[in-house]
Amino acid sequence: MKKSFIISAAALSLFALQARGEKLGELLHNFTYQARIGYNLGGTAPIGMPATIRTLHSYTLQPNLLLGIDAHYPLDNKWGLMVGLPFEGKGMKIDAGVKNYHMTMMKGGEQLEGMFTGNVITKVDQSLATIPVQATYDVSEKLRLKLGPYFSYVTAHKFEGNAYDGYLRQGDPTGPKVELGHEDGERGEYDFSSDMRNWQFGIDVGADWYFSKRCGAYVGLTWGLSEVFKKDFHVIEQSMYPIYGTIGLSYQLK
């Protein structure tokens, strides 16, 4: 009797495992996978142009490549879910004119803090591993829309630059005046890399267009909702957010 019970229990367990395996296999079979390559274009900036930033002299493109893979699961013939893992760069280099812009910088081995009027060059480099989780809607067989949150871990970051051709009023706009020139040694240097966050999150919206069965193109926009700097960082008075557009190509693996 006991032996029969053990055999029956073992058989039921095998049937249950087989049924679960079939369901898991069916679930995995419905996934499709894509590889992506793209380019990010944008910047780390405040929301709205503050009055202290007067002009943008130049914007220099950076090697903001994106390489990733994502998986899509259809919920019905229109809606689905997509999750991905892109490794990407988000960087910028700008030259801007500012007035009464609060800054901390080094000049001649001395730290200066106050209100700067003149020109600033800022370079931002970030390397990130990102997980977007998006709802998808298939407008047609060729066009898919996507929207959802993203979460990024910043594996490396840099925020540095220099101030030149202007002057710094130490402390406040009426403080002692320090002249800054154009040549090396005459500029004020700054580096806020250690004040940047390691985690970011925001909204990711985009569209995929398939021009063949496996190949396609895509566009996207990632809008950061978390500031790039830590809470206790107050040198730059405006909150700074990563805002980038993406354009690229995709290839369906399965």
Predicted segments with their positions:
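Transmembrane beta-barrel strands of outer-membrane/channel proteins
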Residues: 35-41, 83-89, 147-153, 219-223, ...
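Outer-membrane beta-barrel biogenesis signature
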Residues: 17-34, 77-78, 100, 164, ...
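Outer-membrane beta-barrel channels and translocator barrels
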Residues: 28, 74-76, 140, 212-214, ...
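Extracellular/periplasm-exposed beta-strand and loop segments of Gram-negative cell-envelope proteins
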Residues: 43-62, 90-127, 154-200, 226-244
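Repeated loop/turn-to-beta-strand initiation elements of outer-membrane beta-barrel proteins
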Residues: 78-81, 142-145, 213-219
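Hydrophobic, lipid-facing positions within transmembrane beta-strands of outer-membrane proteins
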Residues: 31-33, 63-69, 129-133, 201-205, ...
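Outer-membrane beta-barrel "beta-signal"
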Residues: 209-210, 241-254
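Residue-level signature of outer-membrane beta-barrel architecture
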Residues: 71-73, 137, 153, 209-211, ...
